[in-house]
A protein has these predicted regions:
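ASCE RecA-like P-loop NTPase motor cores
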Residues: 1-210
Length: 210
């Protein structure tokens, strides 16, 4: 017999999921500007996730000074001379800090409470098309295999936002091309909204101010 237990978290009230439709994901200036305004709207407690180190570096150099001017510390994997675990520890300890990272941070972050209240992906975390992946893809179903990996990564990252019953957070995807099927693994109560950047900023500020 299968027993289905309800989630202890009220995702419908505590979480928001947004896909921003008017940011050019290939333009680091646009991505940096979007992250800057979203991070400021959240007052920090923000994690920016990237699928490529070079894009992380390009965005970091455009973010660090504007955030510092507003009193928000910015840490970054591949830039700060610290391992991912130490960066996450610092991020966890500083309630209003911001952190940029790639897959090691995405997979390792465990930050309950206000220290993580906003999570922003620069684009869909598709698997890297290396030789091993190509072989697995051919064996396990082509695009469906890629979809399964991306869905799992998105669901895992989303799950980092709500770790306790009193947590609340906003998940943002800066990839207008993100197909809706990839969000099927999010909790059923979470409605994914496709919005402009201005609307996303407003939703982040209003949701986290409650």
């Amino acid at each position: 017999r299968t027993v289905r237990l309800d989630s202890p978290f009220d995702y419908g009230a505590k979480a928001r999921a947004l896909v921003v439709t008017d940011v050019g994901r290939d333009d680091p200036r646009q991505v940096a500007a979007a992250m800057r305004e979203l991070f400021l709207a959240a007052g920090g407690g923000a994690l920016g996730l990237f699928t490529a180190i070079r894009r992380l570096r390009a965005v970091h150099e455009r973010l660090v000074e504007p955030l510092a001017e507003r009193g928000l510390a910015l840490y970054a994997q591949h830039i700060d001379p610290l391992d991912p675990g130490t960066l996450i520890d610092i991020f966890r300890a500083e309630k209003d800090a911001c952190l940029l990272g790639t897959d090691a941070v995405r997979d390792g972050v465990d930050v309950p409470g206000e220290a993580l209240r906003l999570l922003v992906f620069d684009r869909i975390p598709w698997p890297r098309p290396d030789i091993l992946h190509k072989a697995r893809r051919e064996r396990f179903g082509g695009r469906g295999y890629d979809d399964a990996i991306a869905r799992a990564r998105i669901a895992q990252a989303f799950g980092r936002l709500i770790r306790r019953a009193d947590d609340k957070g906003v998940f943002v995807m800066l990839d207008a091309a993100a197909p809706s099927r990839l969000f099927a693994s999010l909790p059923p109560a979470v409605v994914v909204e496709r919005v402009s950047l201005v609307e996303a900023i407003e939703r982040v500020a209003s949701h986290l101010a409650r």
